[in-house]
Amino acid sequence: MRNTRVLISGASIAGPALAYWLDRYGCQVTVVERAAGPRPGGQAIDVRGPALEVCARMGVLEEIRTHRTGLRGMSMVDGDGKELFSTTERTASGGQLDSPDVEILRDDLSSVLLAAGGDGIEYLFNDSIASLAQGPDEVAVTFHRGGSRAFDIVVAADGVHSSTRALVFGPEEKFLHHMGGYLGVWTVPNYLGLDRWEVIYQMPGDVWGGMVMSVRENTEARVYIGIDSDEPPAELLGSRTVSDQKRLVAERYRDARWEMPRLLEYMWGAPDFHLDVAAQIHMDSWSRGRVTLVGDAGYCGSPMSGQSTSVAMVGAYVLAGELKAAGGDHTAAFAAYERELRGYAVANQQLALDNKARKDAETTSRGQEPDTNPTDIGDGFYEVVNSYTLKDY
């Protein structure tokens, strides 16, 4: 296999998964990550359908199951804490509880994937790609912390706001499809005493209310908030610092009741606070020359699809497999990768568009009344989830 020097930008989910497979196939893999180390925090994410088989082939399926959230159900409350709805059949974050899906915290899944890669993979934390120049035989890369190196292939696995994608394909405004909202997440103590349980608080206005779920054997909880806004990220978030973003959330939630005031107090000291746009990435092509995209950087489905993580893991498997099948011929491999996966990625993006349209219609018809069926994922969800079968490479 030729073209074995591969640089991957991003060390969250798609990056470590791709690194695992490329290392297994004999590549010299380097992963560069802007953060100083594995990033803590993030929402609970779901591993479904063929992504479960990817985990099984990596030998980590049982381990991720040991880290699953293990929620027993969910309830909804009003501003006074009165229960409006309760179920032990499903949750808003993870869907049907009797499914084979694995709901796991983003940072837990990332840790498992990073560990699976072993010592053969080089990780460069606290750094990122400053520039790259493609030549006929290699890509010359310079890093923000200094120094330059040559690689045969560069893969952007650095998410919706991929700086690597911007260097090669142009600014994200060309590719970002705004879904009309922003999602915030942070960790708090489980002071509510939730026992593998999820609670949703809904409120009227331009916010989605709040959600709290106990995690890690009830030792802590994750808080979710949502803001309705069509403002592009460059305007709503722009150059705002994390402290500025927290002030934005506090201002939007100034009239919130139930436990939201206390949860917002915890937000101020939360080191893992994260606020970002709910968006999709639509690309006419996933590759240009010796550079290609994987996961959210190329085909993010948004949190509204419930499938971004799974599609990213499948994408990593397919990209590595097609490189192996092509003997390292990046031109042939990138074309085969996109042929193989684009239909699945687009179908999963459509899930999010359908879910948003359905929820918008329900909100319009419901008015200010609380949603008492907040976790219905719609017909055909699992048909799409399971519509792709992994190839053997």
Model-predicted segments: where are they?
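Flavin-binding catalytic cores
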Residues: 237-271, 343
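Conserved mid-domain beta->alpha element of the FAD-binding
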Residues: 6-36, 155-156, 184, 247-249, ...
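Conserved SAM-binding loop
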Residues: 330-393
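Histidine-centered metal-chelating micro-motifs
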Residues: 162, 183-185, 207-210, 298-299
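Conserved N-terminal helical subregion
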Residues: 1-6, 23-25, 48-187, 232-250, ...
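Active-site substrate-recognition segment that forms the wall
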Residues: 198-234, 253
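Short glycine/proline- and charge-enriched loop/turn segments
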Residues: 33-36, 90-96, 230-234, 352, ...
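Short helix-loop capping/hinge motifs at secondary-structure junctions, enriched
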Residues: 190-196, 232, 259, 284, ...
